[in-house]
């Protein structure tokens, strides 16, 4: 059953992974994304966090949901930086977002309203709870770079699907 909480920290980090990636994502690595979820599941990972941004985050959440039928105990948790995150999304993506939240095992809403740095706090929240971070990262500046670097500082395993797993490229 799904729970919606403002904050929860009762999971084992070693069995948890998070996703980060660019908003410009058109399914380029969907097969690799599903494969890495299966691989991590085989290594004991059961909980996957999505920050629910446009692009890679939504695709990653959908990949976890699609695999729940074949991977018992697989859980999707969504870290929502503030209510209304999707208000400015295109309508089709806003509907995807709502469908994902409805099917998520847990939704953590981290701030009552938009605040400066709320997206970075969301990224820190996910990384601090994760032993691995799966990325769609081209090496550029921005939120994905911040999360990628923060994962390194937190000693999380980093898997970059952009460069076929050669995560130390960036």
Report residues per predicted region:
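Acidic/glycine-enriched connector segments
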Residues: 7-170
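Extreme N-terminal basic, low-complexity initiation segments
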Residues: 2-6
């Amino acid at each position: 059953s799904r729970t919606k909480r403002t904050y929860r920290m009762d999971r084992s980090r070693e069995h948890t992974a998070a996703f980060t990636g660019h908003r410009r994502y058109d399914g380029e690595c969907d097969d690799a994304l599903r494969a890495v979820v299966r691989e991590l599941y085989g290594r004991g990972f059961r909980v996957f966090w999505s920050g629910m941004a446009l692009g890679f985050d939504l695709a990653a959440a959908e990949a976890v949901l699609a695999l729940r039928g074949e991977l018992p105990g697989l859980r999707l948790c969504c870290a929502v930086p503030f209510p209304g995150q999707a208000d400015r999304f295109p309508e089709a993506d806003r509907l995807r977002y709502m469908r994902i939240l409805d099917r998520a095992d847990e939704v953590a809403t981290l701030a009552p309203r938009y605040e400066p740095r709320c997206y970075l706090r969301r990224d820190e929240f996910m990384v601090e709870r994760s032993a691995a971070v799966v990325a769609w990262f081209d090496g550029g500046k921005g939120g994905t770079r911040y999360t990628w670097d923060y994962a390194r500082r937190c000693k999380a395993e980093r898997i970059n699907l952009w460069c076929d797993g050669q995560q130390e490229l960036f």
